[in-house]
From Swiss-Prot:
Superkingdom assignment: Eukaryota
Nucleus listed as a keyword: yes
GO MF term set: DNA binding
Compartment(s) where it occurs, according to its Swiss-Prot or TrEMBL record: Nucleus; Chromosome
Region annotated Disordered, chain positions: 1-69
Entry keyword DNA-binding: yes
Biased composition (Basic residues): 7-25, 34-63
Family: Belongs to the protamine P1 family.
Organism, scientific name: Perameles gunnii
UniProt-recorded name of the protein: Sperm protamine P1
Organism placement in taxonomy: Eukaryota, Metazoa, Chordata, Craniata, Vertebrata
Record GO biological process: cell differentiation; chromosome condensation; spermatogenesis
The entry's keywords: Chromosome, Developmental protein, Differentiation, DNA condensation, DNA-binding, Nucleosome core, Nucleus, Spermatogenesis
Gene: PRM1
Function noted in UniProt: Protamines substitute for histones in the chromatin of sperm during the haploid phase of spermatogenesis. They compact sperm DNA into a highly condensed, stable and inactive complex.
Length: 69
């Protein structure tokens, strides 16, 4: 992002392009919001295996703590 701040002329030209296609950007934002939810679900499933392994070790530790208590 620092490159955008350093090159102000480029950022202005890019903002002008974004201002011209605001309707398209809004439509894309709505689609991205839906796709992001699907992608988040997909990422959740993809990482769920890793999280399941980590949480499994954490659950075992919690169970060990309850057993020790």
């Amino acid at each position: 992002m620092a490159s955008y701040r350093n090159s102000r002329s480029r950022s202005r030209s890019r903002f002008r392009r974004r201002r011209r296609g605001r309707s398209r950007v809004r439509g894309r934002d709505a689609r991205q919001g839906r796709s992001s939810r699907r992608r988040r679900r997909g990422k959740g499933r993809a990482h769920s295996g890793k999280k399941g392994r980590r949480s499994g070790s954490r659950r075992r530790k919690r169970n060990n703590n309850t057993e020790n208590k």
